[in-house]
Amino acid sequence: WGTSVFENDSACDFILNVENSPTVITDELVRIREIVEEEDYLEVDEGSSVLAMAELVLNSFGVNPIHEIAKKIDFTLIKETVALTFLNQLISLLELVLDVDNNNRSELFELWEEADPKDFAEWKNISFDLLEGIKKIRDEQFAN
């Protein structure tokens, strides 16, 4: 368990699923959105998957260097599946994971909040960088 995106089992499991089928990224986004709509809360596993998803999208657009664990993924297919709607939904989920609205609907955020303050700050910085990166891709790729 660590502060970077892929230093947890949930993100690693997500990576393996995407390796087998890059389009699973869209299915996972839909599944997580349905959970949020039903429960108005995001468990730690889904929160970790959202962060991993954001990292993979950034990788597919060449924004971040590809982490060793994700070297086998076909990023071309991921990039082809990313549309404006996908990015907007991903942004909403990232904001929920990061508790932007202060509504305490993210187990992952709560766990990091209880961690060592230095680790929490590092995790937040990494995670907010993902959010900003996704917003930038949306704005650059889908500007009117």
Residue ranges of predicted features:
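Hydrophobic core segments within long, regular secondary-structure runs in both alpha-
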Residues: 22-33, 54, 83-95, 124, ...
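Hydrophobic/aromatic-lined pockets within catalytic cores
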Residues: 15, 19, 58-61, 135
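Low-complexity intrinsically disordered segments
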Residues: 90-144
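Amphipathic protein-protein interaction modules
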Residues: 52-114
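Amphipathic alpha-helical elements of HEAT/ARM-like alpha-solenoid repeat scaffolds that form extended
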Residues: 7-14, 50-57, 109-110, 128-131
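Short terminal alpha-helical segments
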Residues: 1-40
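Short, solvent-exposed segments of well-ordered alpha helices
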Residues: 9, 40-47, 77, 81
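Short, well-structured hydrophobic secondary-structure segments
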Residues: 25-64
